[in-house]
Amino acid sequence: MNKVEGGGHKEEVVVKEKEVVKEKPSEATAEGVQAGEAKDLPGSLKTQRRKAHREHPPEVLSKLHPLQYRWVLWFFKNDRSRAWQDNLQLVTKFNTVEDFWAVYSHIKLASKLSSGCDYALFKEGILPMWEDNRNKQGGRWLLSIDKQLRHFELDRLWLETLLCLVGNCFEEYSREVCGAVVNIRTKRDKIALWTSEAEDKAGVMQIGQIYKERLGISTKTIIGYQAHADTAAKSNNLANKFVV
């Protein structure tokens, strides 16, 4: 089973401080995560949502702002003694703006996760793995973030990525966007935006250009797109399929 991180390839882009302008997985909420993992995923989302519904009158709840898609938040913690898919936990699902912010406000920031942990946000029905049918023919825009920026830029870049997803900021090509992953690693962290059609150059390029602009990355910095099929081959000379 392939992991949702991509690392160590020669063509990956490293964002440095001067370059930044600005079904096996088990369903579990934060309260359902096993005791050994709880320190990496605090807070009870179910409890918070129940509390919100108790405290807000029906007329307020009726004014919730629906999202175009229903989204699923996943949490991964690397444990080599377990199968890869058994390390993947479904945290929660949401389909309104208000629930998105409730989720984001009650989980750890990406920068606070332990090394070897991931967050993934994907459209409902798409698993955060290469083998999923919606991902097989796709690829990802990959951003590698210098570890010195973890506590300065990682959370901003990840939040902006999430807002791009739930806000459908990729216009007509939002349908080709599957989700995004943030990998917390010892040397460099990574953020990847996954799309479904690696051969759709027009769509991939439009998504990449909008994404780069939304992240506030310098025009002098090149970010690359890699097809999942190429990444799965684990080539030491993996070349970017597209760049912006």
From Swiss-Prot:
Belongs to which family?
Belongs to the eukaryotic initiation factor 4E family.
Region of interest (EIF4EBP1/2/3 binding), residue spans: 65-68, 101-105, 160-167
Please name the InterPro entries in this protein's record.
TIF_eIF4e-like, TIF_eIF_4E, TIF_eIF_4E_CS
- Cleavable signal peptide: none
Q: Which chain regions cross the lipid bilayer?
A: none
Q: Its Gene Ontology molecular function terms?
A: RNA binding; translation initiation factor activity
What does this gene product do?
Recognizes and binds the 7-methylguanosine-containing mRNA cap during an early step in the initiation of protein synthesis and facilitates ribosome binding by inducing the unwinding of the mRNAs secondary structures.
Tell me the organism: Mus musculus (Mouse)
UniProt keyword Protein biosynthesis present: yes
The protein here is known as Eukaryotic translation initiation factor 4E type 1B
Q: Name one GO cellular component term.
A: cytoplasm
Residues given in the record as mRNA binding sites: W84, Q85, W130, E131, R185, T186, K187, R188, D189, K190, A233, K234, S235
Which residue stretches belong to region Disordered? 1-57
